[in-house]
Amino acid sequence: MLRSDVLVIGCGIAGGTAALELAESGLDVAVITRANRAGESNTYWAQGGIIFRGENDSPESLAQDIVNAGAGLCHEQAVRTLASEGPPLVQSILIDKLGVPFDRTPDGKLALGREGGHSIARIVHATDATGRAIEDKLIEALRAHPRVRL
C-alpha cells in the first residue's frame, strides 16, 4: 500500500511544482498520472513560451496587456495576481531552481520574444518545445527528491 502525507494527481507544471514545493517543506508526496510515462502531460506538448518580464516591464504593464488580449473579459484579481506573482515564480522555480534551458542571446541574457497581445518582449522560450524543456527538468527534480514517489 502506498502511503504519503500528500497525493498529487498529475505531473504537469501545476502538479509537478506543487509536489516539489510540498516535498521541500518536509512532506512525503506521492504523484500519480494517467499518462503512460511521467512527464507525458499537457505541459510537455506546449510549444509556445511563458510570460516572464521584459526590459522596463512592470506588473501594471503586464496586467494591462493581459486585459487587452482578453478583450476585457478577465477576472481582475486573477490578472493582478498573475501579473505580480507570475514573473518572480518563473525566475525562482523555472530558472533558478530547475534550470530550464530557455533560449539565450549570444551574451547570455534570456532571449525574450514578443507574442500576440503583449506590448513588449517578455516571453521566454526553449526553442519551439518550451513545455518539454520545463517538463523534463521538473520530472528530473521530482525523481531526484527523496520525499517524492512518482
Task: Indicate where each model-derived feature is located.
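Short helix-loop-beta connector
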Residues: 1-3
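N-terminal Rossmann-like FAD-binding beta1-loop-alpha1 element of flavoenzymes
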Residues: 5-31
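Conserved N-terminal/central alpha/beta ligand/cofactor-binding core
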Residues: 34-150
